[in-house]
Regions:
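Short glycine-/small-residue motifs
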Residues: 128-129
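Vicinal oxygen chelate
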Residues: 1-13, 36-85, 92-120, 132-154
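Conserved beta-strand-loop-alpha-helix junction that forms the acyl-donor binding cleft
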Residues: 16-22
Length: 154
């Protein structure tokens, strides 16, 4: 497996999804969203932008999560968590991903501080795709929140 550089603050956020068909989901995250496979099999690790998507066939419980069963969303219209992808140009991404087969719920819609739209992956996981439109907003990495509590106590 290729190695991503270690995160500067010692942490990186990875999104873990459960799929009924790991290969189908791999194709979606690589061919439609443009990620690249870093580890094949089950799970599949896909590098996407500056993070990882881990695609797993589900299962459980396991010794470290003895009461947890991993499964796909039973109802894709009832969501408690979703992936949020921030982009520089939402209209360009919408056109590109639509051409690659992404099925958006709606075209991008303007909201007070962002323009956004949503897609679902093949298992029904919701994905927000958005662009900040706040003229005062700076979403560059220099303005991301710190990932360590130690800095707050200094």
């Amino acid at each position: 497996m290729a190695e991503l550089p270690p995160p500067p603050d010692g942490i990186v956020l990875t999104h873990f999804i459960v799929s009924d068909d790991v290969e189908r989901s791999r194709r979606f995250y690589t061919e439609v969203l443009g990620g690249r496979v870093e580890r094949a099999g089950d799970p599949v690790n896909v590098a996407l932008a500056n993070s990882w998507i881990v695609i797993n066939g589900g299962g459980g419980p396991t010794d470290d999560k003895p009461t947890v069963i991993l499964e796909t969303p039973p109802d894709p219209d009832r969501v408690s968590s979703f992936l949020n992808i921030r982009v520089k140009d939402i209209d360009a991404v919408y056109a590109e991903w639509s051409a690659r087969g992404a099925e958006f719920l709606t075209p991008p819609k303007q909201h007070p501080y962002e323009k956004r739209c949503y897609i679902r992956d093949p298992d029904g996981h919701l994905i927000e795709v958005g662009q900040t439109t706040d003229p005062q907003g700076d979403w560059s990495p220099d303005h991301w929140p710190s990932s360590t509590a130690a800095e707050e106590s200094e």
